[in-house]
């Protein structure tokens, strides 16, 4: 029975739960089946949320602080603002705030306490504007892993952290579904990190857009497979109900029917169409009615602050808050709701372990592999880096990496440093830093050219590493050294790579012939992969702002 499962789970996590701050006012919320529940009494938790962040896309509003290096504003690090705004959240019956970018180097204690005292939970995105999974050239690498775990380390101590988003609208149409494999790998690894760190079991999920061609497949994809790999919850940024509408005519009925069999909680990670202002928010009564609460776990209205996009509930000027008509309508509707709530006492033991079969990739609209990218392993990358005989010179600017990748990958097969989320194939060094990956392929070319000194030069951009060590002991925790990664279920081609962990080349060559310049003819990388690698590096070093 579920009561036995819950008792065992409670015992297993008792130590970590006792360390959570503010538990008396905001007991931890847990996931069981397709709903959230309060851990202390088993009552269903429905999200009554507001998106809470200014300048989430990366610009800095004047007056927030004078730090020129700040890339975004972390609202949970501004205690004065939290004190200013909490009354408006309480008055509008709010129990959840979504924050899109956390600064893990800032202090969040005071804001988290303010919101906990008000019964408010936080669901936070793990990325930030310049460190996120890029839908056009997706990676799951060490920089992202470090960023994500750093946010978790900072926020895990608070009982009113409801969960973490590992991505927001990364895949947004049929052309970039492969990016979802990288987000799902991030979810898998963050769940594992939380568990291995002995933190309480904080849910990790994904926030999707509402694209009609992929919305069913993407929901199934993130909720399918093993319990270790799948998302703990699934959010949809939903803007279908505009002005005066109904459950049937808005599309809500169809969306509810489409995901009614989802085995994890689903909710509106954003909602609030602004085609007509002031917004009436008549959808709130339906969202929290019996028509939807068995399938949906509430929603997060977009957004608190009035900005250029005209989605705000209030206008803020310094410490002055002016409520808009949108806020008044929202507040009125939120204070009318009286939803029926489920309870864990009605669940069976199977509810906690149900899962879905992953969507196939035969259809043209869905191509994300179930074989996921490997876990980024810093010690493995360091080991490989130390073993390379030819490396990129330390004085080479990162801005020049793209040209070097383009040059060397025109000579050899660079699949060892590339990743393909549609085929489920991930190179042995695909998650390492740009510098390590560039050194890897420079070394591969150097070995392929029989260690000719001229093959490790590239006009002074490469140099011989006289301290190179044997690489036979380089082993990745995830098993990536053999080209393997995890599979979240279903059938997909197993990940593989043509290069060994030592960086030696195994690309095919012609029958001993060489070009007039003395360069062996080797298997060249496909133009698609080559352009992809160059674009990734260019975006990285150029500080490209991507969707997060």
From Swiss-Prot:
Its main location: membrane. Residues 518-548 form a propeptide. Pfam families: Glyco_hydro_72, X8. Residues 1-20 form the signal peptide. One of its GO terms (molecular function) is 1,3-beta-glucanosyltransferase activity. It is a lipid-anchor; GPI-anchor. One of its GO terms (cellular component) is cellular bud membrane. Keywords: Cell membrane, Disulfide bond, Glycoprotein, GPI-anchor, Lipoprotein, Membrane, Signal. Coiled coil: none annotated. One of its GO terms (biological process) is cellular response to calcium ion. SMART domains: X8. Induction: Strongly expressed under conditions of alkaline pH but not expressed at any pH below 5.5. Required for apical cell growth and plays an essential role in morphogenesis. May be integral to the pathogenic ability of the organism. This is pH-responsive protein 1. It comes from Candida albicans (strain SC5314 / ATCC MYA-2876) (Yeast).
């Amino acid at each position: 029975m579920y009561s036995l499962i819950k008792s065992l789970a409670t015992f297993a996590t008792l130590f970590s739960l006792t360390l959570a701050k503010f538990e008396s006012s905001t007991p931890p919320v847990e996931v069981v089946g397709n709903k959230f529940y309060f851990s202390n009494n088993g009552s269903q938790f429905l999200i009554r949320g507001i998106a809470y962040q200014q300048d989430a896309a990366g610009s800095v509003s004047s007056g927030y602080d004078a730090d020129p290096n700040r890339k975004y504003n972390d609202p949970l690090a501004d205690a004065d603002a939290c004190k200013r705004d909490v009354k408006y959240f309480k008055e509008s019956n709010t129990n959840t705030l979504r924050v899109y970018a956390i600064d893990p180097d800032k202090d969040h204690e005071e804001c988290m306490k303010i919101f906990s005292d008000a019964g408010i939970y936080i669901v936070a995105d793990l990325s930030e504007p310049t460190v996120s999974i890029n839908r056009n050239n997706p990676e799951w690498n060490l920089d992202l892993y470090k960023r994500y775990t750093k946010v978790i380390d900072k926020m895990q101590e608070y009982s009113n952290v409801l969960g973490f988003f590992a991505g927001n609208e990364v895949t947004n149409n049929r052309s970039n579904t492969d990016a979802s494999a990288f987000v799902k790998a991030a979810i898998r690894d963050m769940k594992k990190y939380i568990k291995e760190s002995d933190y309480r079991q904080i849910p990790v999920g994904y926030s999707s857009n509402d694209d009609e061609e992929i919305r069913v497949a993407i929901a199934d994809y993130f909720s399918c497979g093993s319990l270790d790999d799948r998302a703990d919850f699934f959010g949809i940024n939903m803007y279908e109900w505009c002005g005066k509408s109904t459950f049937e005519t808005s599309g809500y009925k169809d969306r509810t029917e489409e995901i009614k069999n989802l085995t994890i909680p689903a909710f509106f990670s954003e909602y609030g169409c602004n085609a007509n202002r002031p917004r009436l928010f008549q959808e709130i009564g339906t969202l929290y009615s019996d028509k939807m609460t068995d399938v949906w776990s509430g929603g997060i209205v977009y957004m608190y602050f009035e900005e250029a996009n005209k989605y705000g509930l209030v206008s803020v000027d310094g410490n002055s808050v002016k409520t808009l008509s949108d806020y008044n309508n929202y507040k009125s509707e939120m204070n009318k709701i009286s939803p029926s709530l489920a309870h864990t006492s009605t669940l069976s033991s199977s509810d906690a372990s149900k899962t879905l079969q992953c969507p196939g990739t035969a259809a043209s609209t869905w191509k994300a592999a179930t074989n996921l990218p490997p876990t980024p392993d810093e010690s493995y990358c360091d080991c490989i880096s130390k073993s390379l005989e030819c490396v990129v010179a330390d004085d080479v600017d990162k801005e020049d990496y793209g040209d070097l990748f383009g040059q060397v990958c025109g000579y050899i097969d660079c699949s060892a440093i590339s990743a393909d989320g549609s085929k489920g194939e991930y190179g042995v060094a695909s998650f390492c830093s740009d510098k390590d990956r560039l050194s890897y392929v420079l070394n591969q070319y150097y070995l392929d050219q029989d260690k000719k000194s001229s093959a490790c030069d590239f006009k002074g951009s490469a140099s011989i590493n006289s301290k190179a060590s044997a690489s036979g002991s380089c082993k990745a925790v995830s098993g990536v050294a053999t080209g393997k990664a995890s599979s979240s279920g279903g059938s997909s081609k197993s990940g593989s790579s043509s290069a060994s962990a030592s960086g030696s080349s195994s690309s095919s060559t012609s029958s001993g012939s060489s070009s007039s310049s003395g360069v062996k003819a080797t298997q060249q990388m496909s133009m698609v992969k080559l352009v992809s690698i160059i674009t990734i590096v260019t975006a990285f070093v150029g500080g490209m702002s991507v969707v997060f």
